[in-house]
């Protein structure tokens, strides 16, 4: 069951996140479903309702993340933590492809998060492409891979 946070808390989280999903960096303004408040560390795993444990998340990222905080890397045989927007900077783990359609991992944490949340599923890539044509993606100031021709 989803917890209801006060409008003041929700507003503070939205402003802090620049109205972006803190995982996939979709802009809430253009989404058909309002973003949700995510517990970075789920309550079931010892997380709490403090602002230091809350993140703005689109419906899809929140649903895919669920209670996950890490995933098993089968090649390495170890758990890799997912990106924690309260402790880490997005640009340290991710960069947009030169065309802005795909999120590229820069680290194992980025790779694990992209896989767990399915950040580059076909439908969202198509939506990003349409948003690029409308000049509303990628987000202003977002790190973009250099085009190497």
Report each predicted region and the residues it spans:
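Short edge-strand/loop segments of extracellular domains
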Residues: 39-40, 45, 74-76
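Short, charged surface segments at domain edges that flank catalytic/cofactor-binding sites
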Residues: 1-23, 48
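Flanking scaffold residues of small Cys/His-coordinated metal-binding clusters
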Residues: 16, 32, 49-53, 82
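Extended charged
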Residues: 1-8, 27-30, 55, 63-149
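Short beta-strand-alpha-helix junction that forms the catalytic/metal-binding core
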Residues: 21, 45-65
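Short recognition patches in nucleic-acid-associated and regulatory proteins
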Residues: 31-41
């Amino acid at each position: 069951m989803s917890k209801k946070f006060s409008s003041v808390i929700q507003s503070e989280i939205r402003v802090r996140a620049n109205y972006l999903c803190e995982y996939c960096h979709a802009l809430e303004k253009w989404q058909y479903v309002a973003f949700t408040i995510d517990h970075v560390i789920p309550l079931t795993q010892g997380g709490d309702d403090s602002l230091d444990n809350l993140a703005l998340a689109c419906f899809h990222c929140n649903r895919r993340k669920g209670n996950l905080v890490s995933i098993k890397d089968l090649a390495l045989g170890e758990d890799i933590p997912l990106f924690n927007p309260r402790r880490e900077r997005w640009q340290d783990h991710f960069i947009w492809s030169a065309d802005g359609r795909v999120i590229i991992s820069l680290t194992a944490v980025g790779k694990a998060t992209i896989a767990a949340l399915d950040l580059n599923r076909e439908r969202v890539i198509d939506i990003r492409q349409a948003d690029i044509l409308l000049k509303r993606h990628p987000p202003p100031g977002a790190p973009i891979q250099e085009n190497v021709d």
